[in-house]
């Protein structure tokens, strides 16, 4: 693989050259502090929320430069008239070509090592498990036979505060800056006097800090003075020209933190030190953290704890073994890690997006369903947080922030169809049906009917009494069922799953076929919950509702060879053969399978149409053909360049919907081929693909783009990861939770003769060996549990805390 490879155990991706096609990044995080770091230490950090509590400066357009970041400049003063040697220990920002370089992105840490000028350096970046900071554990070795005297300059650029307000009003926000060197404790503080979101102004009580375990010989806090006029991090005047002025205060201008250290290295000698960067409430807490981690032993202990935690989280649960080692590497390690990152930070912080902060309702619902098999406690926590966003009328806020509460934007209409599936999966995984009786508050805010604003509402968000989780779900689904247009399909409103279909319902009349299908799936799941609690009458009510919506879909949503996508405010059907552009959409074909709406000849026709119009060498396109000009009745979906984003890209999230659908249809080889086309470690040309080989992209540029077909975009924070994990483990390998136990029903490529899944479930561990002697794609002939044959495909939990052998014979 060009540019790098996985370690032998698959737990690290090793990058062999600093100049990758795009920055290849990692997320280092605990539950509150997060650092995003590239292979050259570019990136930023935040505390609790990447918008409102950004620590370091960064913006998406910086991706092309991979700056600024977490740097250590090195300078060797040479004898006589020889010019000083200056370089950076992470290649960036000086870009001095090293003699040797390696970056290892691991689970919870990143290591950057290089050799230059006879000095080997290694920096391990990580975030401790329980503290609100990041540590840079630095090692320097003099590889020569002469003593070396080095000046070292750890460096970051502050943002400190609300990222969006900084982008909009940087000239004003900078005036709030106060950065200073604390002489008593030898550290630099970064602070803003006020927290400002719009006109909401309050005192900013958090203090960012930067320190080192080495003796401080100098310091800098003012960016312009440090860099010099018209310079960037690539030419810092203070270092290159020896103009380090020890300015202790930065007031009302761009601030940095840079410390100066002097290190003498005898021949072959190694020295270690640690840099501490973080944010706390109050200066005293920062000082305590700095003093703690100036002790190298404490820093190393924290590193081991971080490594142990992530290894336990990732390796200590589901493990698969198949004939495809690339498949195994992704499923066993990297997609799990990506699912964790998405669960912790949703769709907010990245190198690609603006970083709007908070967590999304529908995103978190899907992410927490995906993680339930490896961390059901986190799923339970998220379920109750999401449910608290539901209003009494059944609508919901689109998300929430740990710093500013529920999101007050107009929500997309699909929020109502995701949480029921998550609750169902949680109960199937744990048996904890008591969660349905948990009391959760209802949200009260300015929105009425999910569309209109109550002009009489004063203030922000409050609660409006409470109800059980079961009642919240019922209200959620009933609102979606009743909020329909003239054809009886749910209104699309501002948008459904596809954010970019944002004009089809701006008059609040447009309808969504896809949303109707997703609703049918959720209605059926709610029937199961009703049966679980013994409410027969309500179960029958929701069976009728599911049938009613199914009949409507098949009456007005079928186009002859596939399902339409929806109807605009003016009644124009799109996702139909008569529409110009966007004639067939992937989502409505996939969800016709997922919801059970498609039956008989419709079932076969949508598979044929999907293969004919949507599938390609890089995966299934979101729709076909792409829009070539603006369609005002649909919105910005038609404004993107052909093949990018929602305009007919290979949208990986949606493509995995279809992978699950194909497994439901028994098409194992097609499902496997489809999932492989999207796996980042299976791409053939990384100069084309560009994105990281170890995490999923949001999309690949689609086939109608003139020259970028197959390029990966918007990695890490995408619903793709959760659906990829579920598709692989629960549908292709076919080991999935059920209320009464583990359902084992694989859908394999015909070439696979055997595979296995190690699956913890309700306190037991089930080692499932799957045999496929005749190369079938679907069908279970026999199942044996600890040598005893059982009837059917359901393995009932033994609940004895032991390991059990399960032999599955397909046929």
Positions of the model-derived regions?
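Aromatic-lined, polymer-binding surfaces characteristic
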Residues: 317-320, 324-327, 338-345, 350, ...
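Anionic coordination/interaction segments
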Residues: 1-364, 377, 382-389, 425-430, ...
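Catalytic cores of carbohydrate-active enzymes
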Residues: 155, 170, 397-398, 518-635, ...
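Aromatic-rich carbohydrate-recognition surfaces in CAZymes
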Residues: 368-488, 512-516, 520, 649-671, ...
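Carbohydrate-binding/catalytic loop surfaces
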Residues: 351-358, 397-416, 443-464, 490-511, ...
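Surface beta-strand/loop "capping" patches
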Residues: 737-768
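Short strand-turn-strand beta-turns centered on an Asx-Gly dipeptide
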Residues: 784-788
